[in-house]
């Protein structure tokens, strides 16, 4: 049986002492074949939280941006500075 996981990198609340929260959302999805980032949160906080969770964002294969609000795309530049090879999926007007 294949194992899939979804890890919250950025959300309004935190349940781990060392992580930080902010308004926004970023989820790290791991499948047997792919690593997917769903949204990037409001800032570069996803980079810090990913490091604390031992998630290497350089291994992300694809980034999915749900919509163009800043609390879902604000960390885009920070993510692309870490990973310039991931395929980005979004509506044309987001970029």
Locate the predicted segments by residue.
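Metallo-beta-lactamase
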Residues: 94-95
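Conserved beta-strand hairpin/beta-sheet module of binuclear metal-dependent hydrolase folds
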Residues: 5-53
């Amino acid at each position: 049986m294949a194992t899939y996981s979804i890890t919250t990198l950025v959300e309004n609340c935190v349940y781990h002492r060392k992580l930080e929260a902010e308004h926004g959302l970023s989820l790290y999805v791991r499948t047997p074949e792919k690593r997917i980032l769903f949204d990037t949160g409001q800032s570069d906080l996803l980079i810090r939280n990913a490091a604390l969770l031992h998630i290497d964002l350089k291994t992300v294969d694809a980034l999915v941006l749900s919509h163009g609000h800043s609390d879902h795309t604000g960390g885009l530049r920070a993510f692309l500075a870490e990973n310039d090879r991931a395929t980005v999926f979004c509506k044309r007007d987001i970029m």
